Amino acid sequence: MDPVERLIAAESPERAEHVLVVNAPGLVEAARRAAPRVSLWCDDRRDAGTVPTGLLLEDFDESSLAGVDLVWLRLPKALSALDDDAERIAAWADPRVRVVSAGRQRAMTHSMNDVLGRHFDTVSASLGVAKCRALRASGPRRRRLRWPRERTHPELGIGVIAHGEVFATNRVDDGTRLLAELCPDIHGDELLDLGCGSGVLATLLARANPGARVRAVDVSRAAVASTLLTAEANGVAVEAHWAAALHDWPPECLDVIVTNPPFHRGIAKDSEPALAMFDDAARLLRPGGRMWCVHNSHLPWRRRLAEKVGPTAVVRQNPFYTVTRSVAR
């Protein structure tokens, strides 16, 4: 267990009937000592791969949460993600449910208390321990679910539906928008949105390429679900996959890859996921296939893409974001 997980366990009631562990796989063994029944929800495929599959929930829904009387939750970075999780727990868990959540103090704000307070009658905070702090909640308020949420973007001609865990939720962030404006002119028979988020790029590619096979991949369950909802709402077909790597995909199977790669994992900056995505692209693109990438302009991705994928040119740029096109060797 890391310090956040240790604090969750330390601040928890000694016993429960059914513990649900949310995005904190290191707590599984402690949960087994605390309750006869344990379930685990992992949004991130990389976390899910570290625990026994028999504990993993297939969905975070009413049937999965029924009877849960204790929730151990790692606080997410985004308030929207906490709001989405909290409203489902409050709506569907046992009326006696107690939530013990924690995070690193540098990443916490008082707004997290406010979010929990929208869904629970009682919210309290622990003292700081090892630069972490716990938030406890009880007394769930049963309310109509507000997630996932839809927003129309007339300038792109689409609506976006997203869960709270998805980056930018149902908005279109400035980087994605810069690449999205090019999607009507990106064509191929086999296309992939790598790190699909809410499915904006995949949906636009499917619209621009009727009859083509458009796939989308993300490590986040919420992103995959949101992509499917967004595609369906816009009347296009997209195959969405929950995956952390594409080792099982055959080489040279794609004509086009588009991506807005992450450079954070949680609250920590991490370039490795983006570099791994570039490696996947190099293997999956057919010779002459194209990779379209949008990234923060200060990052050295043009050079890394040229090294890993092939000749790379800047297609569009502003002071904040750059779109590059790489041609696979």
Q: Which residues does each predicted region cover?
A:
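Conserved SAM/SAH cofactor-binding pocket of Class I
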Residues: 1-52, 174-259, 265
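Short SAM/SAH-binding signature in class I
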Residues: 68-74, 254-262, 292
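Short acidic low-complexity segments
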Residues: 56-67, 240-248
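SAM-dependent Rossmann-like transferase core, predominantly class I methyltransferases
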Residues: 130-190
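Conserved Class I SAM-dependent methyltransferase catalytic core
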Residues: 86-87, 99-120, 127, 268-327
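A short helix->loop->beta-strand "cap" motif at the edges of active sites that frequently abuts
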Residues: 36, 94-97, 211-212, 289
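General small-molecule cofactor/ligand-binding pocket signal
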Residues: 58, 100, 126, 161, ...
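N-terminal auxiliary segments of SAM/dcSAM-dependent transferases
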Residues: 79-154
